[in-house]
Amino acid sequence: MAVAEGSSGRPRAPVRPDRNLALELVRVTESASMGAGRWVGRGDKIAADQAAVDAMRAMLDSVSMDGVVVIGEGEKDEAPMLYNGESVGNGAAPEVDVAVDPLEGTRLTALGQPNAIAVIAVAERGTMFFPGAAVYMEKIAVGPEGLGAIDINASPTENVNALAKAKSVSPRQISVVVLERDRHEDLIGELRQAGAKVNLIRDGDVAPAIAAAQGGTGVDMLYGIGGTPEGVISAAALKAVGGGMQGKLWPRNDEERQQLLDNGLDPAHRA
């Protein structure tokens, strides 16, 4: 805390330094990572996730913001903290929407594998996309070269060719990350038929989505169906680093589809 003197020579009130919200949020994710870090390789993904949640929630209380969790650990009756609608921060300006995933990749952590991360995204109040009942969404994530080239409504072959053209490379030089799931069998086959290299991952698609926008990672595109909360957070991260993402909500059944339609969210349209 700094103290300045007035023109009379008398000390003025203490001058508090401006607080940088981005740096404060780094401390939040750092705390969550350190909390989960004690559980790396110990085979208990539930304990790892809880440690990350506890650490992130405690640190959020010190952040200078008036935040509301839009995407969190679930509804209030499902999660004791970081639930959807919970107020976080110390109540000071700015007013923001908050999306959190204290530990993205709980199984990766439990198994001692890489690419588990703690993530948080903030946006001006009322601007964070809320996916409603949608648990999953179709996603395509790319770097700056892919902006304007990809189309979630186009075929995988068309998107591989479009990205290759935008990056001035052969389709055989395009590397695509896909979650290893049965639902992706046709997608994987078409991507390979188009000439792309397919890197399969078991869990955690936020890290490779961000990697698609960073040079030297060996990732050109993330493709496929994954969690909607992770999709929103990935989109925020990609926007910050100059990449891009397109997505469509992917209802698991007719009941979920109707819930989305009732809330004004049409799964047939890009989110």
What role is predicted for each listed range?
Residues 2-14, 21, 211-229, 233-271:
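Oxyanion/phosphate-interacting regions
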Residues 1-99, 161, 165, 206-207, ...:
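N-terminal subdomain of lithium-sensitive/metallo-dependent phosphomonoesterases centered on the IMPase/IPPase/PAP
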